[in-house]
């Protein structure tokens, strides 16, 4: 039996409500589709300013306040996907290789593994296992006093995987292995040599530990055939004992970077600073100056993100326009390249694209200089 549809009936009210909700949902989808994403931030600095200035949420946690800050919109990323992303992930599992992209929960994993806007595909392989001997309060990598022994096949397996991926730029990082006499420096160096033996054109960056300040280990890495020697200072001097493991020291980091450049002047040296841990502008400026005086040529600055409830809380979400300010200061201080943005990480691919250009130009100039003159 059919009944008449009455405008004021419960059914009519539900239909009108559903229609209104559908319309609102469509409006939200349209706004999201038309809104800026992180690529827009990279390509258009003006967008950074408007997004940061228009956000009315709380960006700084006051002293003694326990509640976590709400994530601002410029730190939200898309789910990683794509053929190249899937290919790399599957091969990593097959060869039992670890990446810092996954272990450290990097927000840029989809962009880096997939190739992104400029087509430069990058990945960051984490050597010597997934367990570190240090326990920095910002890092989500597992820790143990004595991790499992090194896999002697890892250098060859890593090189084979990288050769099959067709990457342009590879970053090798590692856990700290204070339990080993050489800190694993020979293992890292052998991996670089295996990679270069299979593809001499690929650019290799090594983001390495401080090796407890052992300069023999630093020299081993500096002269193994890599292109970029990276070691992160992580934070300002005042916060270093609070943020990093007690065996890591601010001045020791500067010395490692200085000596790496002395051992091999042709290297590009690189470091990274996290913001949002309670540092002041003056302290950031001092750290950047210290790095430049240590001969560091490339610098990245990014937002610290609390990986789990057990790690340091974020004190402040730094606005995109503030990151832009630090990029400009880096250029003023004379860094060859400064990558500064909320989602920038030490192995961020936009920086690698630029560094690749620097390295290619240097190699071309070296070839010209070594060519026989008529």
From Swiss-Prot:
Which parts of the sequence belong to the Radical SAM core domain? Answer: 117-336
Q: Which GO terms describe its molecular function?
A: 4 iron, 4 sulfur cluster binding; lipoate synthase activity; metal ion binding
Per the record, the pathway is:
Protein modification; protein lipoylation via endogenous pathway; protein N(6)-(lipoyl)lysine from octanoyl-[acyl-carrier-protein]: step 2/2
Q: How is the cofactor bound?
A: Binds 2 [4Fe-4S] clusters per subunit. One cluster is coordinated with 3 cysteines and an exchangeable S-adenosyl-L-methionine.
**Claim: Transferase is one of the keywords in the record:** yes
List UniProt keywords, sorted A-Z.
Answer: 4Fe-4S, Iron, Iron-sulfur, Metal-binding, Mitochondrion, S-adenosyl-L-methionine, Transferase
Q: What family does the database annotate?
A: Belongs to the radical SAM superfamily. Lipoyl synthase family.
Name this protein carries in UniProt: Lipoyl synthase, mitochondrial
Q: Which organism is it from?
A: Drosophila pseudoobscura pseudoobscura (Fruit fly)
* Lineage of source species: Eukaryota, Metazoa, Ecdysozoa, Arthropoda, Hexapoda
Q: Which gene encodes it?
A: Las
């Amino acid at each position: 039996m059919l009944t008449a549809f009455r405008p004021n009936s419960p059914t009519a009210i539900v239909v009108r409500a559903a229609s209104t909700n559908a319309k609102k949902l469509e409006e939200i989808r349209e706004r999201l589709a038309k809104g800026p994403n992180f690529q827009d931030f990279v390509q258009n600095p003006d967008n950074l300013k408007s997004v940061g200035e228009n956000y009315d949420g709380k960006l700084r946690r006051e002293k003694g306040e326990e509640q976590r800050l709400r994530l601002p919109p410029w730190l939200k990323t898309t789910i990683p996907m794509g053929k190249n992303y899937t290919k790399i992930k599957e091969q990593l599992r097959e060869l039992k290789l670890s990446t810092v992209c996954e272990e450290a929960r990097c927000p840029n994993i989809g962009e880096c593994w997939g190739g992104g806007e400029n087509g430069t595909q990058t990945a960051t392989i984490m050597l010597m296992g997934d367990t570190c001997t240090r326990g920095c309060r910002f890092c989500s990598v597992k820790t143990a006093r004595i991790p499992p022994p090194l896999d002697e096949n890892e250098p060859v397996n890593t090189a084979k995987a990288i050769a099959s991926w067709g990457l342009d730029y590879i970053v090798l990082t590692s856990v700290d292995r204070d339990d080993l006499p050489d800190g694993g420096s020979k293992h890292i160096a052998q991996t670089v040599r295996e990679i270069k033996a299979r593809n001499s054109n690929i650019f290799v960056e090594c983001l390495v530990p401080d090796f407890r300040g052992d300069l023999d280990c630093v020299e081993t890495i500096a002269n193994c055939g890599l292109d970029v020697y990276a070691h992160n200072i992580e934070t300002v001097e005042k916060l270093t004992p609070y943020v990093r493991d007690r065996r890591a020291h601010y001045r020791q980091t500067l010395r490692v970077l200085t000596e790496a450049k002395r051992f091999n002047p042709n290297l590009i040296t690189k470091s990274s600073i996290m913001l949002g841990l309670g540092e002041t502008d003056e302290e950031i400026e001092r750290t950047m100056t210290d790095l430049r005086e240590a001969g560091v040529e490339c610098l990245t600055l990014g937002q610290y993100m609390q990986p789990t409830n057990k790690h340091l809380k974020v004190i402040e979400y730094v606005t995109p326009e503030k990151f832009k300010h630090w990029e400009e200061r880096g250029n003023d201080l004379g860094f060859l390249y400064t990558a500064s943005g909320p989602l920038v990480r030490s192995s961020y691919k936009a920086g690698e694209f630029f560094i690749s250009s620097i390295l290619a130009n240097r190699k071309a100039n070296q070839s010209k200089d070594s060519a026989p003159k008529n």
